[in-house]
């Protein structure tokens, strides 16, 4: 599949709000964006008009917005659509960071477009963007419990320390590649990240 050369203008970290969900598997995307904002010295702040916590920063001369929706996971699209409409950001300039059952902890994979794969956050974003699936995704592996009936309980729990550390390692490995994505160099970001994790 051809990689795009679209510069990423919005990075969205998916998760559920509230202390009971902090650092659960389902909040891996939120953890990524919160750590990125902190590391770049631009912490997120509550922004009601965007239904989430928001920050705006400069990465290598490129204007990039960071968003963590404070709606629940299955309403994430409300926040994404609000930012995209306000700043006139096309779906292909959006990167959604989310937990991925089909990858083991410690893996991080970039992907362009595609379906929602049963992920309620992705499902709502696709719907809120007018059924547009063209946004990028950073998939952070959390592993699978082995039985579909166990998934909803599994994703809302904290991972055991070994798995949690592997997820954190993947988050740290992926963060430097945001600079490549901000300038539209998907090919380099994919090649280097996928060889590391």
UniProtKB/Swiss-Prot annotation:
This is Peptidyl-tRNA hydrolase. The lineage of its organism: Bacteria, Pseudomonadati, Pseudomonadota, Gammaproteobacteria, Cellvibrionales. The active site is at residue 26. CDD domains: PTH. The record marks 16 as: Discriminates between blocked and unblocked aminoacyl-tRNA. Belongs to the PTH family. Hydrolyzes ribosome-free peptidyl-tRNAs (with 1 or more amino acids incorporated), which drop off the ribosome during protein synthesis, or as a result of ribosome stalling. Catalyzes the release of premature peptidyl moieties from peptidyl-tRNA molecules trapped in stalled 50S ribosomal subunits, and thus maintains levels of free tRNAs and 50S ribosomes. GO terms for cellular component: cytoplasm. Its EC number is 3.1.1.29. TRNA binds at residues 21, 72, 74, 120. NCBIfam families: pth. Coiled coil: none annotated. The record marks 99 as: Stabilizes the basic form of H active site to accept a proton. GO terms for biological process: protein quality control for misfolded or incompletely synthesized proteins; rescue of stalled ribosome. InterPro entries: Pept_tRNA_hydro (IPR001328), Pept_tRNA_hydro_CS (IPR018171), Pept_tRNA_hydro_sf (IPR036416). It is found in: Cytoplasm. It comes from Saccharophagus degradans (strain 2-40 / ATCC 43961 / DSM 17024). It catalyses: an N-acyl-L-alpha-aminoacyl-tRNA + H2O = an N-acyl-L-amino acid + a tRNA + H(+).
């Amino acid at each position: 599949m051809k990689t795009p050369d679209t510069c990423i203008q919005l990075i969205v970290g998916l998760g559920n709000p509230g202390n009971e969900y902090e650092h659960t598997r389902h909040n891996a995307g939120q953890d990524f964006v919160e750590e990125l904002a902190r590391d770049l010295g631009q912490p997120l702040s509550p922004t009601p008009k965007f239904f989430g916590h928001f920050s705006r920063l400069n990465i290598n001369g490129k204007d990039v917005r960071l968003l963590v929706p404070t709606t629940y996971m299955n309403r994430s699209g409300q926040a994404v659509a609000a930012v995209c409409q306000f700043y006139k950001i096309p779906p292909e300039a959006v990167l959604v960071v989310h937990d991925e059952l089909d990858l083991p902890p410690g893996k991080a994979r970039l992907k362009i477009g595609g379906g929602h794969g049963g992920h309620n956050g992705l499902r709502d974003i696709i719907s809120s963007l007018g059924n547009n699936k063209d946004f990028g995704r950073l998939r952070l592996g959390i592993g699978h419990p082995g039985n579909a009936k166990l998934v909803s309980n599994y994703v809302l729990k904290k991972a055991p320390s070994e798995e949690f550390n592997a997820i954190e390692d993947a988050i740290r490995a992926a963060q430097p590649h945001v600079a490549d994505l901000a300038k539209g160099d998907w090919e380099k970001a994919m090649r280097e990240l996928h060889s590391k994790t």
